[in-house]
Amino acid sequence: SLALLKQKGRPALSKAILILINLILIIGLIFSYTRAAWLSVICAAIVGALVYFKVNFKLLSFVAILSIGMIYAQWDKIQMVLAKNTHEHTTEAFDEKIQSAANVTTDASNLERINRWDCAYQMFKKKPLIGFGPGTYAFEYAAFQDPENLTIISTNFGDMGNAHSEYLSALSESGLIGMLLFMSVVAAIFYSTIRLYHRYEKNNDVKILVMGIIVSLASYFIHAFLNNYLDTDKAAIPIWAMCAMVVSMTISLSASGQSKGMD
């Protein structure tokens, strides 16, 4: 909706409606008190900036490898710092809410998420190639819970939710093959969308729309490391609708025989 608001030539009424929608969405995001949503929006904005400024992929790869190396080298110190973090997700203070995302010692929500991730990994080890089948995690993960990972919100029946990760969900339900295919689809989506963005050089309104799609998709697929909602219509419809928009615009652009300098 921010991308639509930035497009030129919109009637005053249309702009007013979009401003109202954006305000509602921003207020909803803030008062959702959902840490994963806050973090994914921030990361998505960074992705948008990297695309906008055409940051070199090799440079990004170098920075990523360097960052991973530094984290590995300082891992013991990082663990000590994390162990001292006692902020809980139940607090209403914004700064403490953010800090609680790194609390892996006492925060029940974080610990339960770790429990679900471990279950997904154990399920993968049981059936590494093809997994347990689509949609089966919720019915199978109970048997793979480690007693040491159980929290106050865990259940012996394993009847409360999913893997809290699209990627680990695919790994446990479809095996290594399924997860690699899912990640390939995600990579293809971003490759196609970013390529489409750079093909539109002069049609600013279209570039703004495509950038909005890039940031929106990035926010979800980053969020997907911590939650999985593609099995619900509320998430699946907008995500795949945006993918369809990218396909449609790409076909339209190719059919017109224009790549750059579109009016």
Outline where the language-model segments fall.
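A membrane-periplasm/extracellular boundary helix in multi-pass inner-membrane enzymes
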Residues: 31, 52-108, 116-126, 134, ...
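Transmembrane signal-anchor hairpin modules in multi-pass inner-membrane enzymes, especially those
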Residues: 4-16, 57-59, 203-207, 250-263
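Alpha-helical transmembrane segments of multi-pass inner-membrane proteins
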Residues: 1-54, 58-74, 190-195, 213, ...
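Selective detector of the "anchor" transmembrane alpha-helix that sits immediately C-terminal
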Residues: 173-198, 243
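Transmembrane alpha-helices of multi-pass inner-membrane enzymes
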Residues: 42-45, 59, 63, 185, ...
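Long extracytoplasmic/lumenal interhelical loops at the membrane interface
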Residues: 104-118, 122, 126, 130-174
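Membrane-interface catalytic loops of GT-C/OST-like multi-pass glycosylation enzymes that act
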Residues: 32-37, 160-165, 226-238
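Membrane-interfacial loop-to-transmembrane-helix junctions in polytopic alpha-helical membrane proteins
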Residues: 10-16, 29-32, 161-173, 205-209
